[in-house]
From Swiss-Prot:
GO terms for biological process: L-methionine salvage from methylthioadenosine. Catalyzes the interconversion of methylthioribose-1-phosphate (MTR-1-P) into methylthioribulose-1-phosphate (MTRu-1-P). Keywords: Amino-acid biosynthesis, Cytoplasm, Isomerase, Methionine biosynthesis, Nucleus. NCBIfam families: eIF-2B_rel, PRK05720.1, salvage_mtnA. It is found in: Cytoplasm; Nucleus. It is an enzyme of class 5 (isomerase). The record marks 179 as: Transition state stabilizer. It comes from the Eukaryota. This is Methylthioribose-1-phosphate isomerase. The lineage of its organism: Eukaryota, Viridiplantae, Streptophyta, Embryophyta, Tracheophyta. It catalyses: 5-(methylsulfanyl)-alpha-D-ribose 1-phosphate = 5-(methylsulfanyl)-D-ribulose 1-phosphate. InterPro entries: IF-2B-related, IF-M1Pi, IF_2B-like_C, Initiation_fac_2B_a/b/d, M1Pi_N, NagB/RpiA_transferase-like.
């Protein structure tokens, strides 16, 4: 992966984690933010896998889009592939399986791979040459990129409206969020941070609060970076300060993202989310999850079935999420899960691009019913 310095902005002056033009993909190296803005050239699926695994790009939607586009770039520039359409489809399916192995918890990646396999399988059945299959794949991956931005804006709109309707004073809101769920975690705009952006755009957001999100510091490095860039009034807090902030009545609502949502609404998200949900319930503060339907996994009946990725001990032993000098005692053992699961019983509502999923007296959500009605 080659580096390419950039100012990190597209023509509309928004932060971009993914810069794609057919045959070319550049990913913002988020490990170096906010002090350095560097893009890495992604030439093929191997580069994409490494970028995802090493946290160059992170955030469930961005991971899925980056994986799909890394393979699109590879096949755009592929020479001397002389196989049949069926062999082309098999080649793509194998690459997609490889990309899915980069990070197992976020369902968006496996969901995207499944959909893309279906596209190439259908294309292979009708194609007379391998290039037609590759072209079908490239176009499908590009549609996913555009669709992600549109769904994020819908999430922001639905979430802002719903939260305002649930508040006694909808004109003065303060919202707490965790990890990074904005333009840097998606193809653009963001999920939970998109809701905050929408509230700010409507002039009703007094303040956004973001946690540091240890140990990789996505909140302090990335969310704070986005909030400052967007000129949204914001305050950074330590993860351990959230309960005190809520006790002082400074939080109207908590909005977080999701890496995987089970059929009952149990939600896997960045480690520390479960703690925030418990604090919010204790202080009678609504706790919302904002996620596209691609983050839902109906094959899992509950969060107990979600595989939780464990990260390197170095992220905790060393400063800057493992990138800096050692700060912990040598020889200490480390438990470093990247995610935790928040039970549906602690979640007030799940904000999607099709509307807000609510409960009717039950601890669980009826995700299947909502999806069926939403079409």
């Amino acid at each position: 992966m080659a580096t390419n310095p950039s100012n990190g902005l597209e023509g509309d002056n928004t932060l971009q984690s993914i810069c794609y033009h057919r045959g070319s993909l550049k990913l913002l190296d988020q490990r170096k933010l906010p002090l350095e803005t560097t893009y890495l050239d992604i030439k093929d699926a191997s580069d994409g896998w490494l970028a995802i695994r090493e946290m160059v790009v992170r955030g469930a939607p961005a991971i899925a889009i980056s994986a799909a586009l890394s393979l699109a770039v590879e096949v755009s520039n592929l020479e001397n592939f002389n196989g049949t359409p069926v062999e082309a489809a098999s080649f793509l399916a194998g690459k997609l399986d490889y990309l899915v192995s980069s990070r197992p918890t976020a369902v968006n990646l496996s969901d995207a791979a499944t959909k893309l396999k279906e596209v190439v399988s259908k294309a292979a059945a009708a194609a007379s040459n391998c290039q037609s299959v590759f072209q079908a794949y490239i176009e499908a991956a590009e549609i996913m990129l555009a669709d992600d931005v549109a769904s994020n804006k819908a999430i922001g709109s639905y979430g802002a409206r719903f939260i305002q309707n649930q508040q006694k004073d909808p004109t003065k809101l303060s919202v707490l969020t965790h990890c990074n769920t904005g333009s840097l975690a998606t193809a653009g705009y963001g999920t939970a941070l998109g809701v905050i952006r929408a509230l700010h755009g409507e002039g009703v957001l007094q303040r956004a609060y973001c946690t540091e999100t240890r140990p990789f510091n996505q909140g302090s490095r990335l969310t704070a970076f986005e909030l400052v860039h967007e000129k949204i009034p914001a305050t950074l807090i330590a993860d351990s300060a959230a309960a005190a902030l809520m006790k002082d009545s400074k939080v109207s609502a908590v909005v977080v993202g999701a890496d995987r949502v089970a059929a009952n609404g149990d939600t896997a998200n960045k480690i520390g989310t479960y703690s925030l949900a418990l604090c919010a319930m204790h202080h009678n503060i609504p706790f919302y999850v904002a996620a596209p339907l691609t983050s839902f996994d109906s094959s899992l009946s509950s969060g107990k079935e979600i595989i939780i990725e464990e990260r390197s001990p170095k992220e905790m032993l060393n400063a800057r999420g493992g990138l800096g000098e050692q700060v912990a005692a040598s020889g200490i053992s480390v438990w470093n899960p990247a995610f935790d699961v928040t039970p549906a019983s602690l979640i007030s509502g799940i904000i999607t691009e099709k509307g807000v999923i609510t409960k009717t007296g039950m601890d669980d959500f009826d995700i299947k019913d909502f999806i069926n009605k939403a079409g």
